[in-house]
Design a protein with these regions (language model features):
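N-terminal-proximal low-complexity accessory segments that begin disordered
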Residues: 1-47
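General beta-strand structural signal in soluble alpha/beta enzymes
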Residues: 20, 144-147, 179-181
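Generic, well-ordered alpha-helical scaffold segments in large soluble proteins
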Residues: 37, 44, 135, 139, ...
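Acidic, aromatic-enriched beta-alpha/helix-loop junctions
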Residues: 39-55, 210-216
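Internal helix-loop-helix
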Residues: 46-143
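A short, Trp-centered hydrophobic/proline-enriched beta-strand micro-motif
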Residues: 140-153
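FAD-binding core of flavoproteins
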Residues: 150-296
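Extended amphipathic alpha-helical segments enriched in small hydrophobics
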Residues: 292-327
Length: 327
């Protein structure tokens, strides 16, 4: 069955470790800092369940309907179908949800388009990506990602920081997988996501192989902690005065791994600085996620232009020559 908002809210009740204002949050989906934004995300899934033809397609492996953000287009018509679904979701937030579920899905889709590049570096890691993509698609998962390093001493590389595990890196490996320790950013929407993709959008140097990794884990994985920034939603005391921050504050966050174990079938890049760069730059990963972002920004601009036009109408200046030129 098509995933609904209720399904998504239930999936977030998983014991995840979320911290804000220096304290552990015991019930993040109902906390004053997050509850409205979480329900805005859930509303996306209610919308797709109510508009199945517009928003979903049948998974080629599970036979269930999932969001079209996971669809690998093979024709112009499918490209148009997928775009229309991205536009429809963006309009629900007027373009203000920057990390809605279709953003990271689009990134993974683009990386899958470049699967041969992964295969040239490591057939095993390529298979892990391919299998995970099918898993995420078939379960219609909401993913976030952390792809930049914590801001510490910017004059130094990751390996030159005072703490060698300030940046998330490999501590150990065994037959079952790898163990990682350290932090990554920005984790936007991590409170309302199911899983998180770790990767590197910033270049790494030779000798920094311990940081040259990409993997995905559930948010509720043992040892994974979400450290949220201050919440705008929590301090927005009037929906009338703060219509955006009361509903669409996705809360950026630092994500810290305290010796998190990652199974091999969830590791996409391992100790390979060249593949870390290629993951986004040589595949369609970066372009595909930016495609979704440009659609969202288009919707946002339409919304802002609509507000500007309405202000001009209310103020009685819509007929002024300089205003007419704008609209």
């Amino acid at each position: 069955m098509t995933k609904t908002g209720t399904d998504h809210l239930k999936s977030l009740d998983d014991g995840r470790e979320v911290f804000i204002n220096g304290e552990r949050v015991t019930d993040p989906i109902n906390h004053a800092a997050f509850k409205n934004a979480v329900r805005s995300a859930a509303g996306l899934y209610d919308f797709q369940a109510e508009n199945e033809e517009l928003m979903t397609f049948v998974s080629p492996t599970s036979g269930e309907r999932v969001n079209k953000c996971w669809m690998m287009p093979t024709s112009y018509e499918q490209l148009v179908e997928r775009r229309k679904s991205l536009v429809a979701w963006s309009r629900l937030s007027c373009g203000f949800m920057g990390r809605s579920p279709d953003h990271i899905a689009s990134s993974l889709l683009g990386q899958m388009m470049g699967l041969p590049i992964f295969e040239r570096h490591s057939p095993e890691r390529a298979k892990a990506l391919s299998d995970y993509y099918a898993f995420a698609r078939d379960n219609d998962l909401f993913l976030t990602y952390v792809i930049i390093n914590p801001q510490a001493n910017r004059s130094k590389e990751a390996s030159e920081q005072d703490d060698e595990f300030l940046v998330c890196g490999v501590v150990d490996e065994d037959a079952q997988g790898i163990t990682v320790r350290g932090a990554k950013m920005l984790g936007t929407s991590s409170i309302m996501a199911n899983e998180v993709l770790f990767a590197n959008i910033q270049p790494l140097q030779k000798g920094e192989e311990k940081y040259a990794i990409s993997f995905v884990v559930p948010i509720a994985t043992k040892g994974l902690r979400i450290l949220s920034r201050k919440s705008y939603e929590e301090h927005a005391n009037s929906e009338f005065d703060y219509p955006l921050s009361t509903h669409f504050d996705e809360n950026d966050a630092l994500i810290y791994c305290d010796d998190v174990h990652v199974p091999w079938d969830r590791v996409f890049v391992y100790r390979d600085t060249d593949m870390c760069r290629a993951q986004f730059q040589d595949t369609w990963g970066h372009s595909s996620q930016n495609y979704q972002a440009q659609i969202r920004l288009m919707v946002k601009l339409q919304f802002l232009m609509g507000i500007a036009k309405r202000i001009a109408e209310v103020n009685g200046i819509i007929g002024i020559a300089s205003v007419v030129l704008v609209f």
